[in-house]
From Swiss-Prot:
Domain of life: Bacteria
Reaction equation(s) it catalyzes: N(6)-carboxybiotinyl-L-lysyl-[protein] + acetyl-CoA = N(6)-biotinyl-L-lysyl-[protein] + malonyl-CoA
Function: Component of the acetyl coenzyme A carboxylase (ACC) complex. First, biotin carboxylase catalyzes the carboxylation of biotin on its carrier protein (BCCP) and then the CO(2) group is transferred by the carboxyltransferase to acetyl-CoA to form malonyl-CoA.
Protein name: Acetyl-coenzyme A carboxylase carboxyl transferase subunit alpha
Encoding gene (name): accA
Molecular function GO labels: acetyl-CoA carboxylase activity; ATP binding; carboxyl- or carbamoyltransferase activity
Assembly and binders: Acetyl-CoA carboxylase is a heterohexamer composed of biotin carboxyl carrier protein (AccB), biotin carboxylase (AccC) and two subunits each of ACCase subunit alpha (AccA) and ACCase subunit beta (AccD).
Amino acid sequence: MKIVFLDFEKGIEEFEAKIEQLRFAQDNSALDISAEIARLQTKSLGLTKSVYAKLTPWQISQVARHPQRPYTLDYVQHLFTDFEELHGDRNFADDQAIVGGLARFNGQTVMIIGHQKGRDTKEKIHRNFGMPKPEGYRKALRLMRLAEKFSIPLITFIDTPGAYPGIDAEERGQSEAIGKNLYVMAGLRIPIICVIIGEGGSGGALAIAVGDTSLMLQYSTYSVISPEGCASILWKSADKASDAAEILGITADRLKEMGLIDSIIPEPIGGAHRDYPVVMQSVKQTLQESLRKLQDIPLETLLQKRLDRLLGYGRFKINQPD
C-alpha cells in the first residue's frame, strides 16, 4: 500500500520517492545499489523521527485523521476472533457509522462497539464519514445492555469528528440519544475500556467513551470541538485552526496531564498507519493489562470510581496567593 503523506511530511515523501525509484531501477537492471537504498532509508527514518519528535497539536490532529489510519474494524480483524456483528437499534435503522458485536479476546467473550469511517468515497458516504445519527447511539446502547445482561466486558473504540449535526438527526433526538448513553454507561455493571484510536470529537465521542479505563493512541485527539470549528467561532476563520489546536489541549500528553485519560499507547514512528502489526501489538498488550486489572476490582468499587471519574470532568483547582 502506497503511503499517503501529509503536508508537513514533504521531506520524508521526497526520500521515499527516491527510494522507490532506486528499488525499481535495481529490479530492472544488474546494478547493485542496495547500499545507496539503505543509506536513503536511514536518512528517511532519521528525518521521520526528527519531524515526529516535535509535532504541533495541529499536526497531530492531521495524523489522527490520516486516511490510512486503522479503524475499528481493522482492530477487530487483528485483535479479536469469532467476531459476530450485531445490527440495528430495533427502532429505526442500522447506522453504519457505529459497528458492534460479540467477539473473543484471548479466549474471553467481550462486547465491541466503535465508530467506523470509510476509505474511499463510496464507503465514506456509507459510513456517514464516521458521524453517528441517533440510531447509531441507540444501537450502541442496545449492545451495552446486552453485554450487561450476560456480564460481558465492554471495549469501545472512539474515532469520530462528532455526532451527525443534520436536521434529520436532531428531529430523531440526537442530544437525547447521547445523553441517555452517558447516563446508562455510568451505571453499567460490567468493566468498560475505552480506546481513542483517531479523532475523539465532542459528545459524539463521549457517547461511547464513559468507562473505567480510558486509553489513547499517541497521535490521536480528544476535544469538545474540532480546531477548525473552534477557530471559526473565536476568530471567524478556520485559518486559525493551528492556534485553536494549541489552546484546546487536544493531544494525548496534555489530556494525560489533566487526568482525563489513564494511559497513552505508543505508535510506530510516523503514525499507526505506517505499521499495523506494531500498533496492534501495542493495543493488544495494553488491553490485556487493563482488562485484567479491572476484573480484579470489586464491582461496586468499580462503579463508584467510574461515577466519580465522570462527575470529575471539568473540575480544576486554582492556587490563590495568601
